[in-house]
Amino acid sequence: MNIYMTAFPALLLWVPVLADDASARAQLIGAWQQQDDAGKGISVWVVETKANSLHITNSQGDQKVSEIDCKPTGAECEGTASGKKTKVTMYFNGPTLVQLETLGSDVIKRQFTVREQPDMMEIEVIPIIGDAKSETLHLKRMPRSAGSR
């Protein structure tokens, strides 16, 4: 009985933490634009929910660079990157969406996080295997178009 008296209050302390994570995760949903130093748009990342999955696209101009539709449960799924099939795993680590992408023998880890400002997102790109460079992309939330909800 004593173990239950100790475990229950400890469990109650985690409820607000889990609620905060859910709120922070919801902030990832939307269209995000990466800009260069002059403020010109470089690429657009769109994060959408589709049933129990996340649908993520990355476009440069009118060309779609990558498209992934995956449940953020850690299960492997397929997507496309630069016109090639890729294997992807996504999961949440607290409020951060972690994406592992395998394209051929290269493996890249991306961490999508909305920081203090809800209109700014960072994507930390970390090469695990391969010659890609580490970088942190800074993106600004794009205004919703009149037709989207």
Regions found by a protein language model. Name each.
Residues Y4, D21-S23:
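Alpha-helical interaction segments
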Residues S23-V65, Q99-L100, G104-K109, D131-K133:
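Short, solvent-exposed loop/hinge segments that bridge or flank secondary-structure elements
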Residues S43-E48, K87-M90, I108-E116, I123-V125, ...:
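Hydrophobic/aromatic beta-strand elements that line small-molecule binding cavities or substrate pockets
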Residues T6-P16:
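Bacterial N-terminal signal peptides
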Residues D20-D21, S66, K71-P72, M120-E122, ...:
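Edge beta-strand at a domain terminus
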Residues Q35-A38, D62-E116:
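Contiguous, well-ordered beta-strand patches that form the walls/edges
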